[in-house]
Amino acid sequence: MSALCLVQFPLHAQVTVVSPPATPAGVVVVAPSTVLVRPLDATVISRQLSTAPKVVIVTQTPQPSVQTTKTTTVVDTPGQPRRVYNSERNVVIVEEQGQSREMPYVTLPVLFEKGTAKLLDEESKVALQQVADVILAVSKTEPGSVYDIEGHTSTDGTNEDNMALSAARAKSVYDVLTQAYGIPASSLSAHGYGEMFPMFPQGNEEQMQQDRRVLVVRTK
């Protein structure tokens, strides 16, 4: 893994690990109602990652705001696209200029050793193999499909440390998928978002564990 040179990050920063897609600066997060169950159902992976992103017309865009409710966190930055993580539908929605682009995703049930990018157990490796199998299968029928590996953390810790850790974990998953399972590098990108998009900004420890997550988002 190549070294990450990180000195200072602004509030809405990210670490680009591999092949960057467009970067959002606003977020709406719909929190899950249940705790993630391991291992990930192969049917869920197949359904989500075989569904291509789509563009729809935004009929009503909420006014820019910053607020927190029991299930939703809204952080808007004027002049920037709004990004929505909807865990009920498992889609990332990017809203800009009257259009909404929906990108299906799966949350990987992978665990890492505390404070590191090293995979913790065999279940994590099995989950990555399941994802690799689906991506390879989809690539045969849709050669242009592309997926982004997103690393996220909880709000616990410093922004700089969380940014570096999320980038390292996204890169770790990227390396396993490309090197161990043969996913073409042209089909993947990787980003670390740190604590930019928490599901539970003021959550307890159990909730913050769900924020320490890695997503595979179909971007094309």
Regions found by a protein language model. Give the residues of each.
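Periplasmic OmpA/Pal-like peptidoglycan-binding modules at the C-termini of bacterial envelope proteins
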Residues: 14-56, 171, 175-220
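Alpha-helix N-capping/helix-start residues
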Residues: 121-122, 167, 185
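Short, surface-exposed beta-strand segments enriched in small/polar/acidic residues
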Residues: 106-115, 134-169, 188-200
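Short, solvent-exposed beta-strand/turn patches at coil↔beta or beta↔helix junctions
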Residues: 83, 89-137, 154-160
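N-terminal targeting leaders that direct proteins to extracytoplasmic destinations
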Residues: 1-102
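A broad, structural micro-motif
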Residues: 102-104, 165, 183
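Periplasmic peptidoglycan-binding/anchoring modules of Gram-negative envelope and division proteins
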Residues: 116-150, 174-179, 216-220
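Short coil/turn motifs at beta-sheet boundaries
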Residues: 103, 142, 207-209
